[in-house]
A protein has these predicted regions:
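N-terminal secretory signal peptides that target proteins for export/translocation
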Residues: 1-9
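A general, composition-driven signal for non-globular sequence regions
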Residues: 4-5, 20, 44
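Short, intrinsically disordered low-complexity segments
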Residues: 9-10, 33
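Hydrophobic alpha-helical segments and their boundary regions
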Residues: 10-13, 42
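Bacterial N-terminal signal peptides
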Residues: 12-22
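Sec/Tat signal peptide C-region and signal peptidase I cleavage site
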Residues: 23-27
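Compact, glycine-rich, soluble single-domain proteins
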Residues: 28-133
């Protein structure tokens, strides 16, 4: 299910992060119009890491997420095959601004695709964005 964002939220709801980190887990801060939230990000910046994603994990720490990085900007699609954790997914612009957020259902094989061409997506525990915004 897609969470609608108002024009105000799309304009001011920004996420800043280090994009090309060689460290697989990196603590970073996300800047929103209502304040700053810290999150530990795992980077999925290779084909194998993007394919694996968060599959076959029992849990995801509340302050953690996975940033998917594709080499080219295009419409991206995600699914929840073999993923038991309820997640929220944000597709991001190059500058980190959140374009759209979706709720993902565990084990779903239905694809959720970005409405725009993107290079980045962030998966976190379901409801995390709502809690910090």
């Amino acid at each position: 299910m897609q969470i609608p964002l108002s024009t105000f939220e799309k304009k001011f709801l920004s996420l800043y992060f280090l994009i090309f980190s060689i460290i697989p887990l990196h603590a970073t801060e996300m800047v929103f119009d209502r304040g700053i939230a810290s999150i530990n990000i795992e980077f999925a910046n290779t084909l194998n890491l993007r394919k694996q994603g968060l599959m076959k994990r029992a849990k995801l720490n509340q302050d953690s997420g996975m940033l998917f990085i594709w080499p080219e900007k295009e419409q991206q699609c995600m699914w929840m095959k073999d993923t038991s954790i309820p997640l929220s997914l944000a597709f991001l612009k190059d500058d980190g601004m959140i374009l759209e957020i979706f709720y993902l259902e565990p084990f779903s094989k239905s694809s959720v695709c970005s409405s725009n061409e993107v290079r980045f997506a962030l998966e976190v525990n379901r409801g995390w964005f709502r809690e910090i915004m």
